[in-house]
Amino acid sequence: MSTYRRVLLKLSGESLGGPAGKGIDEKWLAAYAEEVAEAVKNGLQVAIVIGGGNIFRGLQGVGKGFDRVNGDKLGMLATVINSLGLAMAIRSAGVEAEVFTATPMMPVARYYMRDDAV
C-alpha cells in the first residue's frame, strides 16, 4: 500500500490519441481507465488533469486565422471532451468518476467548487 492517499495524475491529451497523437484511441483510453480504477480499488483517491492537444491546440489556431482567445477556448473544450471520455471509461472499469470544469457547462460537467471536489 502506498504512503499516499491522494494523487494527481497529469495526462497529455496527445497521449489519448495513441501512436498518432490525434483523436481518441479507445485502447489507450481503456488502458488509462484500468490503471486508474486499480489505484482507486487499492484505496487511492485520484484526481486527473488532462489536456486537449489531441483535438485542438489554441496556438495552432492562431496560425490558421483564429484569434488567440477563441483558439484557447476551442482548446478548453477539447479538454472537456477528453475528460468526458476518460470519465466514461473509468466508470466502465467499475469506479465512480466526476468531471469538473472552471467554466459552467451544465449539464455537460459540474462547475468546479473546491468543497465539492475535495
Where are these regions (language model features)?
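N-terminal glycine-/serine-/threonine-rich phosphate-binding loop
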Residues: M1-A47
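Short low-complexity stretches enriched in small and charged residues
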Residues: S2-V7, G52-R57, S83-L84
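General beta-strand structural signal in soluble alpha/beta enzymes
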Residues: L9, A47-G51, A97-A102
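A generic, residue-level signal for flexible/boundary positions that often mark functional hotspots
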Residues: K10, G18, I50, R68, ...
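Short, active-site-adjacent cap segments at secondary-structure transitions
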Residues: S15-G17, G53-G58, M106-P107
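N-terminal active-site beta-alpha-beta segment that forms phosphate/nucleotide-binding
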Residues: E38-V40, Q45-V46, G52-L59, L74-L77
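Ligand-binding beta-strand-loop-alpha-helix segment within the catalytic cores
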Residues: G61-V118
